[in-house]
Structure formats: C-alpha cells, structure tokens
Amino acid sequence: MQLATRSLFIVRVVALSLGVAALCVALTRPQAAEQHHHTVVPADAVKWGPAPPSLPPGAQAAALLGSPAKEGPFVLRLKFPAGFTIPPHRHSKDEYVTVIAGAFAIASGEKVDRASLEPLPPGSFVHLPAGMPHYAVTDVETIVQINGVGPFDVTYVDPKDDPRKR
C-alpha cells in the first residue's frame, strides 16, 4: 500500500509542477506578442489638425503615436506659423523635442528674453527636464516633433498666458 501512496504522491507533484510551468508560459506569451508590433507613418500620411488647447491659437498638431492626454508614450508633431511664441511654461514630465523643418528658437527661464533664445535648425534636438520653465519662438513656419510620456501637462508661469483660460 505504501508504494501506491508514494506513486500517487509523485504523480501529483509532477502534475502540479507541469501545471505551474504551463501557467507561467501562458502568462508570458501574450505580453511578448504585444511588444512585437511597430507603427509606420509615411510623411504624406501625417494628418494635421488643431493643436492641443494648451498651445496658443495658430498651431497645428498631428499625433503619430499615442496621446499626450493618456497614460503611456506619445509622439506628437507640432506645426507653428512664422512669428509664433510659446510663453514660458513647464511640464511635470521630461519633454524631448526634435526640429523637423523651419527654425525653432528656445530658452529656459520664466520671462521671454529674445537675446537668450538658442536657434535650432532642422535636425536639432533638445531635452527639457521636468519642472524647468522654458519658452520658444519661431520666425518662419516650423515643425517640431515632441516625444514624451503621458499624461503630459503644460503649466504656464504666468496664468494669464494660458490659452485655456481665455
């Protein structure tokens, strides 16, 4: 009788081990499969629309991936007309900006000082750390690409500059 009990115990241990192993495999496979896709947006497929209301009027936006308003990574293109100014503001998360076309001039600080602006031609990149006040100006039509992680906020240094409050 002891041999039968011992054999039954071994069978149960092996079955339980196989069940746990199968569960581990089942739980990891869907996650790995979800990570294996990509997003392609050809230049001629970029769809421009209104910019987020946190930007002054006149800007246009095209969401290439995700949404700045939602949890997770996003890629957003912004198109600014010549003579556009983004007043001093900050974000609670890092911002990564690449100049695609035109000329983007940017500086850090709580007041616009044109002498402090650093002109960035196409191909330039700037990292803006969370909490750092900054502002930007365009003298010609300009397109930039913003990469970040949402939800992404904009807080103007001077609340009177916030277009959402007008």
Regions found by a protein language model. Name each.
Residues 37-39, 115-118, 135-166:
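Double-stranded beta-helix
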Residues 1-10:
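N-terminal secretory signal peptides that target proteins for export/translocation
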Residues 81-84, 91-111:
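Glycine- and acidic-residue-biased ligand/ion/polar-headgroup-sensing regions
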Residues 30-74, 159-166:
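A short, N-terminal "cap"/entry segment at the start of jelly-roll beta-barrel domains
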Residues 110-130:
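Short acidic-glycine-tyrosine-enriched beta hairpin
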Residues 11-25:
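Bacterial N-terminal signal peptides
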Residues 86-88, 106-107, 128, 133-139:
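Short beta-strand His + acidic residue motifs that chelate non-heme Fe in jelly-roll/DSBH
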